[in-house]
Protein backbone atom coordinates (compact mmCIF):
# COMPACT_ATOMS: atom_id res chain seq x y z
CA UNK A 1 0.00 0.00 0.00
CA UNK A 2 1.39 3.38 -0.96
CA UNK A 3 1.76 5.85 1.85
CA UNK A 4 -0.29 8.98 1.36
CA UNK A 5 0.87 12.07 3.24
CA UNK A 6 -1.89 14.49 4.17
CA UNK A 7 0.05 16.57 6.65
CA UNK A 8 -0.52 20.22 7.30
CA UNK A 9 2.53 22.18 8.34
CA UNK A 10 1.20 23.55 11.59
CA UNK A 11 2.85 24.00 14.96
CA UNK A 12 -0.31 24.33 17.06
CA UNK A 13 -3.10 21.78 16.80
CA UNK A 14 -6.38 23.00 15.30
CA UNK A 15 -8.27 21.70 18.35
CA UNK A 16 -6.59 24.39 20.43
CA UNK A 17 -7.28 27.39 18.19
CA UNK A 18 -10.55 28.57 19.75
CA UNK A 19 -9.42 27.83 23.31
CA UNK A 20 -6.17 29.77 22.86
CA UNK A 21 -7.91 32.76 21.25
CA UNK A 22 -10.64 32.98 23.91
CA UNK A 23 -8.12 32.50 26.72
CA UNK A 24 -5.86 35.22 25.33
CA UNK A 25 -8.77 37.69 25.11
CA UNK A 26 -9.91 36.94 28.66
CA UNK A 27 -6.44 37.15 30.17
CA UNK A 28 -5.61 40.39 28.36
CA UNK A 29 -8.95 41.87 29.44
CA UNK A 30 -8.49 40.95 33.11
CA UNK A 31 -4.91 42.23 33.10
CA UNK A 32 -6.03 45.51 31.52
CA UNK A 33 -8.70 45.96 34.21
CA UNK A 34 -6.17 45.31 36.96
CA UNK A 35 -3.63 47.69 35.42
CA UNK A 36 -6.02 50.59 34.83
CA UNK A 37 -8.50 49.98 37.63
CA UNK A 38 -6.28 49.49 40.67
CA UNK A 39 -3.77 52.07 41.87
CA UNK A 40 -1.56 49.46 43.55
CA UNK A 41 0.16 47.52 40.78
CA UNK A 42 1.20 44.50 42.84
CA UNK A 43 -1.99 42.48 42.03
CA UNK A 44 -1.46 43.28 38.35
CA UNK A 45 2.15 42.07 38.39
CA UNK A 46 1.17 38.86 40.19
CA UNK A 47 -1.75 38.10 37.87
CA UNK A 48 0.20 39.07 34.75
CA UNK A 49 3.00 36.67 35.69
CA UNK A 50 0.51 33.88 36.41
CA UNK A 51 -1.30 34.61 33.13
CA UNK A 52 1.89 34.23 31.11
CA UNK A 53 2.78 30.94 32.82
CA UNK A 54 -0.72 29.48 32.35
CA UNK A 55 -0.94 30.57 28.73
CA UNK A 56 2.48 29.12 27.90
CA UNK A 57 1.38 25.82 29.46
CA UNK A 58 -1.72 25.84 27.26
CA UNK A 59 0.35 26.57 24.15
CA UNK A 60 2.67 23.71 25.13
CA UNK A 61 -0.31 21.38 25.51
CA UNK A 62 -1.68 22.16 22.05
CA UNK A 63 1.65 22.07 20.25
CA UNK A 64 1.62 19.84 17.19
CA UNK A 65 5.10 18.70 16.15
CA UNK A 66 5.42 17.54 12.55
CA UNK A 67 6.81 14.01 12.60
CA UNK A 68 7.52 11.64 9.74
CA UNK A 69 8.27 7.96 10.33
CA UNK A 70 11.40 7.47 8.26
CA UNK A 71 11.43 3.66 8.07
CA UNK A 72 9.48 0.91 6.32
CA UNK A 73 5.99 0.67 7.86
CA UNK A 74 5.22 -2.93 6.82
CA UNK A 75 3.97 -4.84 9.89
CA UNK A 76 5.14 -1.98 12.12
CA UNK A 77 3.03 -0.59 14.96
CA UNK A 78 4.07 2.88 16.12
CA UNK A 79 3.09 4.68 19.29
CA UNK A 80 -0.15 6.60 18.66
CA UNK A 81 0.70 9.10 21.39
CA UNK A 82 3.41 10.70 23.48
CA UNK A 83 3.53 9.39 27.05
CA UNK A 84 4.69 6.29 28.86
CA UNK A 85 3.81 2.60 28.70
CA UNK A 86 1.53 1.63 31.60
CA UNK A 87 0.13 -1.72 30.41
CA UNK A 88 1.51 -4.64 28.38
CA UNK A 89 -0.71 -7.68 28.82
CA UNK A 90 -3.08 -10.14 27.21
CA UNK A 91 -6.72 -9.23 27.84
CA UNK A 92 -10.20 -10.31 26.80
CA UNK A 93 -11.61 -7.58 24.53
CA UNK A 94 -15.42 -7.57 24.65
CA UNK A 95 -16.54 -4.52 22.66
CA UNK A 96 -15.39 -5.46 19.15
CA UNK A 97 -13.15 -8.52 18.84
CA UNK A 98 -14.79 -10.66 21.54
CA UNK A 99 -11.58 -12.63 21.89
CA UNK A 100 -8.18 -12.43 23.56
CA UNK A 101 -5.79 -9.67 22.45
CA UNK A 102 -2.43 -8.17 23.36
CA UNK A 103 -3.00 -4.70 24.82
CA UNK A 104 -0.35 -1.98 25.00
CA UNK A 105 -1.44 1.19 26.80
CA UNK A 106 0.13 4.66 26.74
CA UNK A 107 -0.72 7.18 29.45
CA UNK A 108 -0.46 10.86 28.48
CA UNK A 109 0.19 13.38 31.23
CA UNK A 110 -0.98 16.96 30.95
CA UNK A 111 2.48 18.04 29.73
CA UNK A 112 2.54 15.60 26.79
CA UNK A 113 1.55 16.36 23.20
CA UNK A 114 -2.08 15.23 22.98
CA UNK A 115 -2.39 14.72 19.25
CA UNK A 116 -2.96 11.04 18.38
CA UNK A 117 -1.53 9.29 15.32
CA UNK A 118 -2.64 6.15 13.49
CA UNK A 119 -0.54 3.24 14.81
CA UNK A 120 -0.55 1.31 11.51
CA UNK A 121 -1.18 1.69 7.79
CA UNK A 122 -4.48 0.25 6.60
CA UNK A 123 -8.20 0.76 6.07
CA UNK A 124 -10.56 1.98 8.79
CA UNK A 125 -13.10 -0.81 9.37
CA UNK A 126 -14.99 0.49 12.41
CA UNK A 127 -15.33 3.70 14.44
CA UNK A 128 -17.39 3.99 17.61
CA UNK A 129 -17.78 6.26 20.63
CA UNK A 130 -18.95 5.25 24.10
CA UNK A 131 -20.05 7.64 26.82
CA UNK A 132 -18.78 6.77 30.27
CA UNK A 133 -17.08 7.83 33.46
CA UNK A 134 -14.05 10.08 33.93
CA UNK A 135 -11.88 8.05 36.29
CA UNK A 136 -8.12 8.46 36.38
CA UNK A 137 -6.90 7.21 33.01
CA UNK A 138 -4.15 4.95 34.37
CA UNK A 139 -6.62 2.75 36.28
CA UNK A 140 -7.18 -0.65 34.57
CA UNK A 141 -10.99 -0.30 34.54
CA UNK A 142 -10.73 3.08 32.78
CA UNK A 143 -10.23 1.14 29.54
CA UNK A 144 -13.80 -0.17 29.61
CA UNK A 145 -15.69 2.23 31.92
CA UNK A 146 -14.45 5.71 30.94
CA UNK A 147 -15.67 7.72 27.97
CA UNK A 148 -13.81 6.34 24.95
CA UNK A 149 -13.61 6.10 21.18
CA UNK A 150 -12.36 3.12 19.21
CA UNK A 151 -10.86 2.96 15.73
CA UNK A 152 -10.41 -0.48 14.16
CA UNK A 153 -7.93 -0.77 11.28
CA UNK A 154 -7.23 -3.63 8.89
CA UNK A 155 -3.60 -3.60 7.74
CA UNK A 156 -2.46 -4.47 4.18
CA UNK A 157 -1.29 -7.87 5.50
CA UNK A 158 -4.75 -8.66 6.91
CA UNK A 159 -4.09 -7.97 10.60
CA UNK A 160 -6.79 -6.16 12.58
CA UNK A 161 -5.66 -3.55 15.09
CA UNK A 162 -7.74 -1.38 17.42
CA UNK A 163 -6.71 1.98 18.87
CA UNK A 164 -8.89 3.13 21.76
CA UNK A 165 -8.79 6.76 22.93
CA UNK A 166 -9.78 7.06 26.59
CA UNK A 167 -10.77 10.19 28.49
CA UNK A 168 -9.34 10.67 31.97
CA UNK A 169 -10.20 12.56 35.14
CA UNK A 170 -9.19 15.85 33.50
CA UNK A 171 -9.73 15.05 29.83
CA UNK A 172 -13.39 15.57 28.97
CA UNK A 173 -13.36 15.66 25.20
CA UNK A 174 -12.18 13.08 22.68
CA UNK A 175 -11.88 14.07 19.02
CA UNK A 176 -11.63 11.30 16.41
CA UNK A 177 -11.00 12.06 12.73
CA UNK A 178 -11.24 8.48 11.39
CA UNK A 179 -14.09 7.54 9.06
CA UNK A 180 -15.12 4.01 8.10
CA UNK A 181 -13.81 2.94 4.70
CA UNK A 182 -11.03 5.50 4.40
CA UNK A 183 -7.36 4.62 4.00
CA UNK A 184 -5.21 5.60 6.96
CA UNK A 185 -1.47 5.83 7.33
CA UNK A 186 1.26 6.19 9.89
CA UNK A 187 2.17 9.93 9.96
CA UNK A 188 -1.52 10.98 9.89
CA UNK A 189 -3.45 12.28 12.86
CA UNK A 190 -6.15 9.95 14.16
CA UNK A 191 -7.52 12.41 16.70
CA UNK A 192 -6.90 14.48 19.81
CA UNK A 193 -7.73 14.16 23.51
CA UNK A 194 -7.91 17.33 25.58
CA UNK A 195 -6.07 17.54 28.91
CA UNK A 196 -4.64 14.23 30.14
CA UNK A 197 -5.70 10.79 28.91
CA UNK A 198 -4.69 7.37 27.56
CA UNK A 199 -4.58 5.35 24.35
CA UNK A 200 -4.86 1.54 24.27
CA UNK A 201 -3.70 -0.46 21.26
CA UNK A 202 -5.13 -3.98 20.81
CA UNK A 203 -3.02 -6.36 18.72
CA UNK A 204 -3.24 -10.01 17.62
CA UNK A 205 -1.74 -12.55 20.01
CA UNK A 206 1.82 -13.43 19.04
CA UNK A 207 2.70 -9.86 18.09
CA UNK A 208 6.30 -8.98 18.99
CA UNK A 209 6.40 -6.32 21.72
CA UNK A 210 9.15 -3.72 21.24
CA UNK A 211 8.67 -1.65 24.41
CA UNK A 212 8.77 -2.25 28.16
CA UNK A 213 6.74 -1.05 31.13
CA UNK A 214 7.40 2.55 32.11
CA UNK A 215 9.16 3.35 28.83
CA UNK A 216 8.59 6.83 27.41
CA UNK A 217 7.04 6.93 23.94
CA UNK A 218 7.11 9.52 21.19
CA UNK A 219 4.00 9.54 19.03
CA UNK A 220 4.60 8.44 15.42
CA UNK A 221 8.25 7.65 16.21
CA UNK A 222 8.51 4.91 18.85
CA UNK A 223 7.95 1.39 17.46
CA UNK A 224 5.85 -0.37 20.09
CA UNK A 225 5.30 -3.69 18.28
CA UNK A 226 5.87 -5.73 15.13
CA UNK A 227 3.05 -7.79 13.63
CA UNK A 228 3.84 -11.36 12.61
From Swiss-Prot:
A single MF term (Gene Ontology): phosphatidylserine decarboxylase activity
Top-rank EC class of the record's enzyme: lyase
Co-factor: note: Binds 1 pyruvoyl group covalently per subunit.
Site positions for Cleavage (non-hydrolytic): 196-197
UniProt GO cellular component terms: plasma membrane
Pathways involved: Phospholipid metabolism; phosphatidylethanolamine biosynthesis; phosphatidylethanolamine from CDP-diacylglycerol: step 2/2
Main location: membrane
Residues of the active site: 197 (schiff-base intermediate with substrate)
Subcellular localization, as worded in the UniProt entry: Cell membrane
Record's subunit section: Heterodimer of a large membrane-associated beta subunit and a small pyruvoyl-containing alpha subunit.
Name the UniProt record assigns to this protein: Phosphatidylserine decarboxylase proenzyme
Native organism: Phocaeicola vulgatus (strain ATCC 8482 / DSM 1447 / JCM 5826 / CCUG 4940 / NBRC 14291 / NCTC 11154)
Lineage: Bacteria, Pseudomonadati, Bacteroidota, Bacteroidia, Bacteroidales
Amino acid sequence: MNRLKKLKKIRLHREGTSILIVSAILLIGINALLFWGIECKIPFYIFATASIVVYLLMVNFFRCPIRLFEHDTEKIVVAPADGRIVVIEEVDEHEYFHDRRLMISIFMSIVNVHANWYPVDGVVKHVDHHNGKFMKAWLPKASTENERSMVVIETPEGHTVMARQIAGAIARRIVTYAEVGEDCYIDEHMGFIKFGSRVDVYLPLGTEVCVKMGQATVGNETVIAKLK
